[in-house]
């Protein structure tokens, strides 16, 4: 398994997906910077302690990172089949189940890594203004959010791949998925079942009751179960080709 994960990571050196992800992260930082320091008239919201860190995290989760993660995940899972090298791999032979699981682990690493890169960039800005008042809890918010968003978008990745659709559709689906969060988030306690709202809840972005946290955990578990079923079907389908 470790060899397969390492192999998948080495394949990324030939991929432009990392550049796409970097562009998306830069856009998030630019937009939040403009909003926090230039769009508030006489009041610069970015000067408030931890405003920039929480603004980058919330804007990224609502509009950019789910789409980036979904696009990346769909690309690396269906890359072999769309580039017509899957049949060659099956001649080696390769354990398709382990290969798909290795790809999923790489997606998890990418999701968490993307959030950590975003955190470090935002943290550097905050350090310039509020080094004395920053707390460790904000790092936890980013870390948990990265893990939860991975589980939230994994069903989209698996569904797009299992249906043999173009991986760019996962970007579109994830963006719609993210946009709906704006409206679902106002529905009260029941909104915690929506995966991206659940991600905000579990990371501590929202103040939540034990019942809301429980609903968020259930949401993540359901995402994991649905993804597990799709991954199993995907590995069996590819093994029969």
Language model region names:
Residues 67-81, 157-168, 223-236:
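Transmembrane alpha-helical segments in integral membrane proteins
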């Amino acid at each position: 398994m470790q060899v397969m994960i390492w192999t998948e990571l080495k394949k990324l050196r030939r991929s432009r997906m990392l550049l796409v992800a970097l562009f998306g992260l830069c856009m998030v930082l630019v937009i939040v910077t403009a909003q926090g320091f230039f769009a508030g008239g006489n009041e610069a919201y970015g000067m408030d302690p931890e405003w920039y860190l929480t603004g980058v995290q919330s804007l990224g989760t609502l509009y950019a990172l789910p789409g980036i993660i979904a696009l990346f995940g769909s690309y690396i899972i269906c890359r072999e089949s769309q580039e017509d090298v899957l049949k060659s791999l099956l001649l080696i032979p390769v354990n398709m189940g382990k290969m798909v699981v290795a790809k999923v682990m790489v997606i998890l690493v990418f999701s968490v890594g993307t959030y950590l890169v975003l955190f470090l960039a935002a943290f550097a800005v905050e350090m310039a203004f509020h080094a004395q008042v920053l707390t460790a809890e904000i790092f936890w918010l980013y870390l948990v959010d990265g893990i939860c968003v991975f589980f939230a978008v994994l069903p989209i990745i698996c569904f797009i791949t299992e249906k043999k659709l173009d991986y760019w559709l996962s970007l579109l689906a994830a963006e719609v998925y993210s946009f709906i969060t704006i409206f679902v988030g106002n529905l009260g306690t029941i909104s915690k079942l929506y995966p991206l709202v659940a991600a905000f809840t579990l990371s501590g972005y929202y103040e939540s009751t034990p019942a809301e946290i429980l609903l968020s955990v259930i949401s993540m578990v359901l995402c994991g179960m649905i993804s597990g079923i799709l991954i199993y079907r995907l590995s069996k389908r590819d093994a029969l080709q």
